[in-house]
UniProtKB/Swiss-Prot annotation:
SMART domains: RPOLCX. One of its GO terms (cellular component) is DNA-directed RNA polymerase complex. The gene is rpo12. It comes from Methanococcoides burtonii (strain DSM 6242 / NBRC 107633 / OCM 468 / ACE-M). HAMAP family: RNApol_arch_Rpo12. It holds the Pfam family Zn_ribbon_RPAB4. Zn(2+) binds at residues 8, 23, 26. It is an enzyme of class 2 (transferase). It catalyses: RNA(n) + a ribonucleoside 5'-triphosphate = RNA(n+1) + diphosphate. It comes from the Archaea. This is DNA-directed RNA polymerase subunit Rpo12.
Amino acid sequence: MDYKCTRCKRPVEIDYGYTGIRCPYCGHRILVKERPQSSIKKVKVE
């Protein structure tokens, strides 16, 4: 999965086997957290 570095805004490929990686362009530390699947609520449009 690709992630955009918050410092240099370049795309960084993330390996979910690691919890922390660094941006190869600027060295900014990226912490990877698994997020639970959110449920999508359907709403009726009137």
